[in-house]
Amino acid sequence: MGIIVNLDVMMAKRKISLTELANQVDLTQANLSILKNNKAKAIRFSTLESICEVLHCQPGDILEYVEDLSLIHI
């Protein structure tokens, strides 16, 4: 069981780069990359809110619950 982050999908849909998003949500590129690559252990609601605001999406567009992570290629 686990949560996967589909940030790269939303970024592609909105045609926004990692650098651009990092600047707009006031995160380092390194921290945003950790989140984008499913390496983050947690995310603050304030960060999630900022990302959703910039990408004009809902948290469910970025975060997805998966019962069996072994079936997902991350």
Each model region followed by its residue ranges:
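Conserved small/polar residues in nucleotide/adenosyl-binding loops
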Residues: 72-74
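Short, basic-rich loop-to-helix N-cap that marks the start of a DNA-contacting helix
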Residues: 39-50
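Short alpha-helical DNA-recognition segment
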Residues: 16-34
